[in-house]
Amino acid sequence: MEQFHGTTIVSVRRGDKVALGGDGQVTLGNIVMKGGAKKVRRIYNGKVMVGFAGGTADAFSLLDRFEAKLEKHQGNLTRAAVELAKDWRTDRMLRRLEAMLIAADATTTLVITGNGDVLDPEGGICAIGSGGAYAQAAAKALADNTELSPREIVEKSLEIAGDMCIYTNHNRVIETIE
């Protein structure tokens, strides 16, 4: 059975502002199944933004578990991510899940990988998914050479990734915390 896959999620933090965005394409093999999926959401009473890439069912399963960890740890993003990563590494079912998450709140951005790693991105910029490398390179160039806001950088980075990656489209969802 082929997996649903392919997306681009990118986050940019600049000063006290952070933006997280993703495209809307869901692909099964070489077929576009949906063009308007929402892979970026707000959780924990709107205080945390999450974007996911990978197998759709796997990503939703991880998102549910992450939200439960946030509730358990009163919104402490780092603690919730580390606890999810611990579960991911020790639970046999979770280890089979093929997904990645970017989570951001007012002060912290984290990447939670399919290996159960929790990464604090360097320079406040990170991206995941099939178009992640394109989006991250574009975001870094824009952040280093312009005064654009995080939202504008995310928007332009997703546009560039959508032009280059066949698994990324131009239907974007972007959330911000200021």
Curated annotation (Swiss-Prot):
Keywords of the record: Allosteric enzyme, Cytoplasm, Hydrolase, Metal-binding, Protease, Sodium, Threonine protease
GO cellular component: HslUV protease complex; proteasome core complex
Gene3D superfamilies: Glutamine Phosphoribosylpyrophosphate, subunit 1, domain 1
Disulphide-bonded residues: none
Transmembrane segments: none
Subcellular location field: Cytoplasm
A UniProt-annotated Pfam family: Proteasome
GO BP terms, alphabetized: proteolysis involved in protein catabolic process
Activity regulation remarks: Allosterically activated by HslU binding.
Binding site for Na(+): G162, C165, T168
Major localisation: cytoplasm
Presence of keyword Hydrolase: yes
Assembly description: A double ring-shaped homohexamer of HslV is capped on each side by a ring-shaped HslU homohexamer. The assembly of the HslU/HslV complex is dependent on binding of ATP.
PANTHER family the record matches: ATP-DEPENDENT PROTEASE SUBUNIT HSLV (PTHR32194:SF0), METALLOPROTEASE TLDD (PTHR32194)
Protein name from the UniProt record: ATP-dependent protease subunit HslV
